[in-house]
Design a protein with these regions (language model features):
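Beta-propeller-forming repeat regions
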Residues: 1-587
């Protein structure tokens, strides 16, 4: 027989070891990934009934010196023995589920799950949660900018994601947007490719496929795009483009200049084009539709690194052929190398404010004008929402509705503190930190409210370059539960490593600890349900025998339990310096 092509499983960060084990006792093999150098050394991916590995679950525990994972009692569920890095204390633990504790209000501190993505070196990739198939549940769309593919994870009724389906698309897709563009009740997906300098649109066909995108005619290089309602009842594709234009020069010869324009296109093919200021030179990172001045008309907000925020304020009627007034406004706290925005109704007036970050806090702002003939525009601060501390660095924000309150809960991603901060508005109308939840990973650039298992938003999604994640606020949470502990009675002993095996033929596996200060083997008996009982111990060698070799590796350095004599009984084999020591099991 031959082996099929390997199925590649990406993972978050780095991993020093991987084991195939049944971690939850369902008789299906799961994956345990270990990185001793990480503050959260253990993470796992459970295998579901469909044979698919679920997202990564990271667990917090003190630093470890070594570990051993095995099914000690034959119940098809893995026990884990760890040796603490500093104290040298051994612990017997299991992966267990527990009901989530209350976080704030009616929300629970549910599970944080991370879905690794196929890695890319591109600075940006398209990521989007949207209801693609019309079942009322949001699906996850992930662009592979290097391979010219689009991965679609359809959401199941229980809130889990199915294995991704792959569809061909442009290479270098940096932006994804979705809306019912043509009013047919189906979701259209828009893709912007920086490599191919194109914008395309596609939607699910009758066979459940996403055909290759049809090009949107632009005749220019697209810089950024979004889709949404600029006018009530219709979605528009909004694109910033850059093209070359020729005009007479000073000496009468033609000169080539770069022109930037805003293009608003409907599904009927009609498009309006508005030239932008010649001073607009930077590379925009995003374009959004938002009523920035709260006049009831949707505006276009453009973010560009190191530049002012450009707002294209929609007029009630065109003026000199232009529907938008182009204004550049200084953000509170100055420009940023990685600008971002969020939207929230922070004062309970039913209108969303623009949330802009300045290191450790957010400011909710509204665009205002002095009303003059040549109006001066600026941002008026309505609220300030502080992070958990002065050392916070807020890199993303999102909201969830809070039952019984006009004001939502505001979630802040704190990159420097590696935490998710939950803020709420108190009875006096002041925003305060209600809770801070530590996160194992914070390599994300965006947050979004999504619904898992429901049409209503009940979860916060995290968006990153090589992974996505989500934090639930209900259900159960995984934890690493200690069942028993053990400290060696060897004086000044230093437990270096551990393995397991049945050394007395009772059907249960014993623990073999390697102690490396006095060169002992320390046997510990595992007794049901989960008790560690001291057993036999002995020195492997006299210290003076290897005195000249004390600068070498700690000894004994490896052990294995196996039947090497062929009598059907397990033996103990040690590796010590340049020797292999065999301890046969006696009859």
């Amino acid at each position: 027989g031959t082996l099929a092509e390997p199925e590649k499983l990406p993972y978050v960060g780095s991993a020093k070891a991987v084991q195939v084990l049944d971690l939850d006792g369902d008789k299906r093999d799961d994956l345990l990934l270990v990185n001793w150098d990480n503050a959260n050394p253990f993470r796992f991916r459970l295998q579901n009934a469909a044979g698919q590995f679920e997202p990564e679950v990271h667990l917090t525990l003190p630093p470890i010196r070594s570990y051993w994972a095995d099914d000690l009692d034959g119940d098809h569920r893995t026990e884990v023995i760890t040796i603490a890095a500093k104290s040298g204390r051994a612990a017997l633990s299991q992966f267990t589920r527990k009901p989530a504790e209350t976080l704030v209000g009616g929300l629970k501190n549910g599970q944080f799950s991370i879905l690794p993505l196929q890695r890319t070196d591109k600075a940006r990739r398209g990521l989007l949660w949207t209801d693609l198939d019309g079942d009322g549940l949001q699906d996850l769309l992930v662009a592979d900018p290097d391979g010219g593919q689009l991965f679609v994870h359809f959401q199941q009724k229980d809130g889990s994601l199915a294995a991704p389906k792959t569809f061909p698309t442009f290479t270098g897709v940096t932006d994804l947007a979705a809306a019912d563009w043509n009013g047919d009740g189906k979701t259209e997906v828009f893709l912007l490719s920086s490599d191919e300098k194109q914008v395309g649109v596609t939607s699910l066909d009758a066979n459940g496929r996403l055909p290759f995108p049809q090009l949107v005619p632009l005749n220019a290089r697209p810089l950024a795009m979004t889709v949404g309602a600029l006018k009530a009842g219709a979605a528009s594709l909004v694109t910033l483009i850059e093209r070359e234009d020729k005009k007479p020069g000073k000496d009468g010869k033609e000169e080539t200049t770069t022109v930037r324009e805003l293009v608003v296109r409907g599904a009927d093919g009609k498009a309006s084009v508005q030239k932008l200021a010649d001073s607009f030179k930077g590379n925009p990172s995003s374009v959004s539709i938002h009523d920035a001045n709260q006049d009831g008309l949707a505006d276009v907000v453009v973010l560009t690194p190191y530049e002012k925020i450009k707002v294209l304020v929609q007029r009630k009627e065109e003026k000199d052929g232009a529907l938008f007034e182009e204004v550049d406004v200084n953000p509170p706290g100055g420009t940023s190398d990685q600008p971002w925005l969020a939207l929230a109704d922070v004062d309970g007036d039913g209108k969303q404010e623009l949330l802009l970050a300045q290191k450790n806090f957010l400011r909710a702002v509204v665009l205002t004008s002095d009303g003059g003939e040549k109006a001066t525009w600026s941002f008026t601060v309505r609220e300030q929402i502080n992070g958990a501390s002065s050392s916070s660095r807020i890199v993303a924000a999102a909201t969830l509705a809070q039952p019984g309150s006009k004001s939502p809960l505001l979630f802040l991603l704190d990159a420097d503190r590696k935490a998710l901060t939950v803020s709420e508005r108190d009875a006096n109308g002041v925003w305060k930190v209600a809770k801070t939840v530590e996160l194992p990973v914070t390599d994300f650039t965006g947050l979004a409210p999504i619904g898992l298992g429901t049409k209503e938003a009940n979860t916060i999604a995290f968006l990153g370059g090589n992974s996505v994640a989500w934090k639930r606020f209900s259900g159960e949470q995984w934890e690493f539960t200690e069942l028993d502990g053990y400290e060696t009675p060897i004086k000044d002993g230093f437990l270096r490593d551990v393995t397991s095996g049945d050394l007395d033929g009772d059907g249960r596996k014993d623990l073999v600890f390697l102690e490396t200060v006095r060169a002992y083997v320390d046997l510990v008996v595992f007794e049901p349900p989960h008790q560690l009982t001291p057993g036999n111990r002995w020195p492997v060698f006299e210290e003076r025998t290897f005195r000249q070799r004390r600068n070498e590796a700690s000894e004994p350095r490896e052990a294995v339990v196996a039947d090497v004599t062929g009598d059907g009984k397990n033996d103990l084999v040690l590796l010590v310096h340049d020797r292999v020591l065999l301890y046969p099991q006696e009859k």
